Structure formats: structure tokens, C-alpha cells
Regions:
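Anion (oxyanion) recognition and catalysis
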Residues: 8, 87, 145
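Residues that scaffold the ATP/ADP-binding catalytic core of kinase and kinase-like folds
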Residues: 41, 125-128, 217
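Conserved N-terminal subdomain of the carbohydrate kinase-like
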Residues: 3-66, 84, 233-235
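Conserved phosphate-binding/catalytic region of the ribokinase-like
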Residues: 102-103, 107, 111, 134-235
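Short, acidic/turn-prone active-site loops that include or flank metal/cofactor-
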Residues: 45-47, 98-100, 121-123, 175-178
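Conserved beta-alpha-beta core of the PfkB/ribokinase-like small-molecule kinase fold
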Residues: 66-139, 158-161
């Protein structure tokens, strides 16, 4: 209940947040090193209980959305089902493939994705290409394009994000800050990007907006409490 309360306090609709009778909420244990980089151990908990039937119950909400964003912290078959529902209603589908998939993602899922936002590890696992330099980055991105995903936003940490679509790639540099904790940086980037795209910002501007939000997050300790407000990000 405390998780739902914390979401409600910041104006997030929790109508479709259910309660599992089988297990506790998912937990992530995060270790942060002296440079601010982190390593994360995850216990999925109730995340694993999200079923395609739960998506069906929320179909009306999905159909009325401008976009849907998903990760891989819930069962892949549920993610794929949500993508199909969104596609049926003409809703943009965005996938942040985190945690990095241990098994190949279903071709049917990737075919329903409009925008994918992987980091280096995730891009390697999805594409099957070892990334060692800029040339191998492009090979990995092209392999993902070939799987049916038209837009790839390859996040590069402190370097920024590489946006590739329609055969062209552009690096959108990050804002330079002194990081203390990179926890929630990727989630903040994805959330801010979705806000920007839902407001019809051009892609480059949307990524700049997301980069700024993430750059603020890494200057603070913690996860939810490190995420900036809209007033802090607007520029």
C-alpha cells in the first residue's frame, strides 16, 4: 500500500495497480561505488504475477493513451501482450529492455515496438553483436532495426544517447555533472522522454529533455527521491 500511496501523492493514477496474494512487492537491492556507478540485484516478487488477463482489464486505458512504455521486469509474454493491444489501437509502443534479457526476445514483440531504448549490455544481448567501438555499435543497432524496430535510442551513460531512425544516427550529448549515484538515471530518462513525446516534442528535443532529467537524478542519492520535478527540468 505504501508504494501506491507514494505514487498517488505525485498524481499517478493507480487504478490498475493490483495486489498479489502470493508474494511481496518486487525489491531491488542497489550497491553504489565511489564513482556513483551501481550494480543491482532484483527479486521480482509480485512483478512476476502480472498476467495477460491484467492487460486485458486495462485495454480501455491503453487504447486512450498516446503511448505505452514497458520494461522487462514483468513476464515477457505479458509485455508482448500489452504491445499487441497497444498496436491494435494505434498506440505508440516504447520498450526499455531492462533488466537485460537472458533469452532472445520474441520476434513478435519486437515487431510491435516503435522505439526501443537499450544500453550497451541490452543492445548486445538483443542484437547478438559484441560492442567494442562505434562501428560495432552501429552493427548492433542495424541488427535491431532488422528485427522490425524502426527507432533505436542507444543510451551511452555520461556520453548521452544515440538516436537512430530512417537510416540516420545522431549523438545527443548528455549534460555534464558530477554524479554521486546513477540509480534511477535510466528510468528517469525513459520517463522524461515519454512525457516529451506525449507532448509532441521533436525527437531531438525530447532526448535533450530526457538527458537533462537524468543528469539531475545522478547528482542525488536514491531512486524515487532523486527524480526531479517538471519545474527543475524545463528549459
Amino acid at each position: 500500500m505504501c508504494i501506491r500511496d507514494s505514487l498517488s501523492k505525485v498524481g499517478i493514477d493507480t487504478t490498475y495497480v493490483g495486489v498479489s496474494a502470493n508474494c511481496p512487492s518486487g525489491v531491488a537491492l542497489i550497491n553504489v561505488d565511489a564513482s556513483g556507478e551501481n550494480s543491482i540485484a532484483v527479486a521480482s516478487g509480485a512483478n512476476a504475477d502480472l498476467l495477460p488477463a491484467d492487460i486485458d482489464a486495462a485495454e480501455e486505458a491503453i487504447a486512450s493513451a498516446s503511448l505505452i512504455i514497458m520494461q522487462l521486469e514483468t513476464p515477457v509474454e505479458t509485455v508482448a501482450h500489452a504491445a499487441r493491444i497497444a498496436r491494435k489501437h494505434g498506440v505508440k509502443v516504447i520498450l526499455n529492455p531492462a533488466p537485460a534479457p537472458r533469452e532472445p526476445l520474441p520476434a513478435s514483440l519486437l515487431a510491435d515496438v516503435d522505439i526501443i531504448i537499450p544500453n550497451k549490455t541490452e543492445a548486445e544481448l538483443i542484437s547478438g553483436v559484441e560492442i567494442t567501438d562505434s562501428d560495432s555499435e552501429l552493427r548492433a543497432i542495424n541488427a535491431i532495426h532488422a528485427m522490425g524496430v524502426p527507432t533505436v535510442i542507444f543510451t551511452l551513460g555520461s556520453k548521452g544517447a544515440l538516436i537512430c531512425e530512417n537510416g540516420d544516427c545522431e549523438l545527443i550529448p548528455s549534460f555534464k555533472v558530477a554524479p554521486v549515484d546513477t540509480t534511477a538515471a535510466g528510468d528517469t530518462f525513459c520517463g522524461a522522454l515519454c512525457v516529451a513525446l506525449s507532448e509532441d516534442m521533436p525527437m531531438r528535443r525530447a532526448i535533450e529533455f530526457a538527458n537533462k532529467a537524468a543528469s539531475i537524478t545522478v547528482t542525488r542519492m536514491g531512486a524515487q527521491q532523486s527524480i526531479p520535478t517538471r519545474d527543475e527540468v524545463d528549459f
